[in-house]
Amino acid sequence: MLTFEHVRKNYDSKRVLEDCSISFEPGKVYALVGPNGTGKSTLMKAAAGLVKINGGTLTYKGQPIGTESKKHIAYMSTEPFYYDYMRIRDVKAFHKDFFADFDADLFDRLLTFMELTPDLKVRALSSGMAAKLKIAVTLSRRAEVIMLDEPLNGIDLIGRDQIIHTIIQATGNGATFIISSHLFDELEPIVDNVVMMKGGKVILEGELEAIRAEHGKSISDLYREIYADIAVPQF
């Protein structure tokens, strides 16, 4: 469905994706894990058509990533992507006009569940509220592939529960989900497959239970083992 074959990506002289190969299959939920700087965000941005790869092939349903694939792939970045002067109702109107698959009624329901109101200004949102808004916007697209980059960052425990519940509900529509997060323990109940990246490459990929059985340890313990040489907080 969404396939990377020996993909390379450079930012100036820095190689951020190196011989990256993986295929994401329809209807599955993938956890994309690894410390900062391992290529997770760049992989997502390339799939969303936001950055151009320098080598290899990247296709969606056999066709190169481009205008057509953007109609079917929704991507939530870690960066804010609204103007400060907007109210939430303006964000809704913008996405309704821009994306044919945007479900305005679903967006309204998600706002209610997330305890957000349409008249709130973007500049007045806390980091947690802004994160919830990004989730609501992205999940309101009826896309075939939904990519969420660190959706639990900056969220308190109650907010995380709301977001996890929302994602669980959304996974029932048959879309492929690709979710990057350091908080794997909280994503574990909804994940089908795990993808680990290091040095811009996919170094381990497979079904969650199969990886546990093969390595005889939890994903968290495996993470600590694989990334022991990288000084980052562990989940």
What does each of the following model-derived ranges do?
Residues 146-150:
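Catalytic Walker B motif of ABC-type/P-loop ATPase nucleotide-binding domains
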Residues 55-69:
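Conserved ABC transporter NBD signature motif
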Residues 160-173:
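Helical segment within the ABC ATPase nucleotide-binding domain
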Residues 78-133:
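ABC-family P-loop ATPase nucleotide-binding domains
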Residues 33-35:
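The feature captures the beta-strand-to-loop junction immediately N-terminal to the Walker
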Residues 2, 17-19:
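Conserved structural motif at the start of ABC-family nucleotide-binding domains
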Residues 48:
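Helix-to-loop junction immediately C-terminal to a conserved catalytic motif
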